Amino acid sequence: MGCNFSSQSKLQVPEIRASRSITPASQKSEDPYSHIRLLLLGSAESGKTTVLEQVRLLYKQHFTESEYFHRRAFIYHNIFKSIKALCRAMRMSDIQFADPINMGRAQSIIADEHGHYGLFSKDLAEKIKHIWNDKSMQKLYARRSQFNLNDSASYFLNNIDKINMVDYKPSERDLIMAYVPTCGVQNVIFTACNQSFQLFDIGGQKIDRRKWALQYEGIDAIFFCIAISEYDQVMSEDMVTNRLDDALNLLQSISEDPAFATTPIYLFLNEIDVFCEKLSVIPLSKYKPDFKGGDQDDAIDFMENLACEALGKRDRSLYRVYRCIAIDTQMMAELLSTVFKDIAKRKK
């Protein structure tokens, strides 16, 4: 597939019916097996919740007012977390602010320990805007592949004036771009290919994984997300374990679990765009010595081979591998349509 991801053709997404809300998995319908049950798994920040959000938007699953409120809170948090990460990166870099006043502004941002889940004060909003618009900060941002930064940082920072309004309501695009960690177990029921599906999303942090086994019964297919761009990053839980290694080990454990011996796995290799951007700055071979070099396509092929190796001796008919950008709605519409057709075909 390579790194050319733009799609020019206009998608014709069929009219789809969906249930009203996301509910904890414990609140299942009276007949839990009346739907094709899908389990969405992956490490934290792998993009799996973005996949769930795409399903909700593409398959007409509307958000409630409380869900908008919840996501709006995390958008403010995303903005502050991003500007704080950029300020810290600036402090560690060889770049100086073009406007010296921004150095003091950045120091105050770094020292601010509040989570900021609501409207910014006028003073804080101005600080963020001045820092973000500094010419030197834009030079630093061009190096973003060298440090851990939310993919949506520029999107939200460029829209801070719109977002920092009392009557702000997130757009569909805002909902997709926001990083909102999964709390507990959520599920959505929708209809595709004349079949009723129920998709479960479970938190991907290590502390949440003990809950996974509670959802294993009666699962018809697994969606597993891996953010391949994280080959150089470590997990926030211990600051030691490589994120990609953790994801591959997790995939291997799922593939080897007797409960899923005959369950098809749909593997989403996510963040292909970020991965390609990183390669020229952070060599893949530094973290994966078995990679002998080549172009971006060779690197992506290598990552796919790693994932297939993690699947072990699983029959080829029991897994599919897709390369994707989870925040790209058009790409995900095409991908999900293909996946749901394949699952529906298996169930006939």
From Swiss-Prot:
It holds the Pfam family G-alpha. Residues 34-348 form the G-alpha domain. A lipid is attached at C3 (S-palmitoyl cysteine). InterPro entries: Gprotein_alpha_su (IPR001019), GproteinA_insert (IPR011025), P-loop_NTPase (IPR027417). GTP binds at residues 42-49, 176-182, 201-205, 270-273, 326. Keywords: GTP-binding, Lipoprotein, Magnesium, Metal-binding, Myristate, Nucleotide-binding, Palmitate, Transducer. A lipid is attached at G2 (N-myristoyl glycine). PROSITE patterns: G_ALPHA. This is Guanine nucleotide-binding protein alpha-13 subunit. It comes from Caenorhabditis elegans. The lineage of its organism: Eukaryota, Metazoa, Ecdysozoa, Nematoda, Chromadorea.
